[in-house]
């Protein structure tokens, strides 16, 4: 999550957050992502762990950034009717992460908000030259699993399927779609689907397993660590 203002601002009903997707290209990206996550929990936690743009400026190397779902900064600006702010935000992220490392994320789950945001995102991408990436917000594996997801949400939130105010997804499109389904859904921008393979090809970080790396902590007063623990 990215803080509305800074990660240190924590005022009720003012300091919310926006979604953002960060992917590791290499070891540098992984280390920077780890630093961002740590700071989000230690310094920026306010309902959710949050980074801010200052941290992104400091730890963006080796990362690929996607503009995220409807809860992202740019879609939210579009939904509020401020296209110019959305465009300015997109250009800020593009300039920060660099050419080829920032993508306008396109999603279409048949929601009313998608009908508003999607055309504007495509327009923005074409005006700025920022590449697009088509994704799907997948919360379950198959389309027919939508009902099971609804039941699980009721269990999580203490509601029943009969409750009118229960949390629910408005469509059954939040599943893992096939390649053909995605190309059909985004037939007007096939490059947005093709770009997902380009992104995957850039993510080349391999975890090193079997080599435990425990942080070193120096005991106070020059004491030996074991002696300090025994004390």
Residue map of PLM features:
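Phosphodiester-processing cores and adjacent nucleic acid-binding clamps
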Residues: 1-231
């Amino acid at each position: 999550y990215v803080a509305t203002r800074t990660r240190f601002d924590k005022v009720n009903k003012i300091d919310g957050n926006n979604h953002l997707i960060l992917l590791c290209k290499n070891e540098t990206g992984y280390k920077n992502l780890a630093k961002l996550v740590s700071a989000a929990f230690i310094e920026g936690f306010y309902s959710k762990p949050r980074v801010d743009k200052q941290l992104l400026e400091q730890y963006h190397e080796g990362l690929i950034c996607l503009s995220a779902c409807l809860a992202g900064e740019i879609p939210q600006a579009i939904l509020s009717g401020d296209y110019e702010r959305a465009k300015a935000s997109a250009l800020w992220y593009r300039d920060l992460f660099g050419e080829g490392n920032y993508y306008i994320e396109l999603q279409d789950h048949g929601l009313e908000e998608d009908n508003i945001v999607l055309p504007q995102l495509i327009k923005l991408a074409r005006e700025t030259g920022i590449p697009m990436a088509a994704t799907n917000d997948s919360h379950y594996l198959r389309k027919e699993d939508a009902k099971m997801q609804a039941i699980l949400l009721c269990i999580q939130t203490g509601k029943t399927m009969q409750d009118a105010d229960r949390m629910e997804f408005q469509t059954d499109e939040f599943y893992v779609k096939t390649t053909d389904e995605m190309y059909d859904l985004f037939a007007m921008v096939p490059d947005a689907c093709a770009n997902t393979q380009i992104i995957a090809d850039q993510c080349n970080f391999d975890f090193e397993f079997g080599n435990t790396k425990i942080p070193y902590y120096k005991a106070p007063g020059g004491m030996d660590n074991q002696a300090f623990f025994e004390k």
